[in-house]
Amino acid sequence: EVYLPYLNNTEKFTLFYGGAGSGKSVFVCQKLILKLLKYPKRTLLVIRKVSASLRDSIYQEFITHLTKFGLIDYCKVMGSSLTIYLPNESKIIFKGIDDPEKLKSISGIDDIMIEEATEITLDDFTQLNLRLRSKAENQQITLCFNPVSKTNWCYKHWFENGTPEDTCIVHTTWYDNKFLPQSYIDSLEQMKKTNPIYYKIYALGEFATLSKLVYNNWRKEDFNWKEVHSKGNTQALFGLDFGYINDPTAFVACLVDTTNKNLYVFDEHYEKGLLNDEIA
């Protein structure tokens, strides 16, 4: 039900992102098949970063839904070239970004679907956007992905500075999928206890950072360090890492609450080119 309002949206760019098991790829496949049936002789290009990953993933997803719709026997399926021709002469072409020469040879593209969009780069996306130059109406690029780091191009381009013009963004999680087996739901709930960061990304579909974190259970909040220290169960600690030209000098001031196992960072400094007397 959460997807139905977006069945016929007209924005040029549509992002379906969120947690694993949310059903977003299923809906997008069904949505695009219906669009291809509505517009005869239309061409849909389906993209993943690596062409070798297409056959067992999104290509098979389209085959599955064409079968469920009772259309597969009326389609011409070219397994060698990963191309599907629909009864009304619309077609679906599956390609990998890692095969740029073959991409250049494709003409008349009317719509593009990018599966696992976080795997490609902004340059890849820009080139794909330039491929939409036919005269067909309602040309669209649809992106599907599970969020990763906020350093990824998807976050920086689509979220960091607000929603861009002519863009529709849809966020869903496994809570929106009524067809999940209980065993899958149980595994996600177990992840919530054992690995909160993975749960945040893969279950809740939020942007986060997966690796190279010393502390992953932190938050920003206002506090008075003097009041915290006055409670008597904290110890003040200060850390200093010397640097100069290539690396900055880093200083951190914190309070350690050993009873409740909390660490309060209340001051820090990070700067290159400091001399010893300036540090002091």
Explain the meaning of each model-derived region.
Residues S25-P40:
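Walker A/P-loop NTP-binding motif
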Residues N177-G243, D247:
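ATPase catalytic-site recognition across NTP-hydrolyzing enzymes
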Residues R42-L54:
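Conserved RecA-like ASCE P-loop NTPase motor core of nucleic-acid helicases/translocases
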Residues E115-E116:
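Walker B catalytic acidic pair
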Residues A253-A280:
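Nucleic-acid-processing active sites and adjacent nucleic-acid-binding tracks
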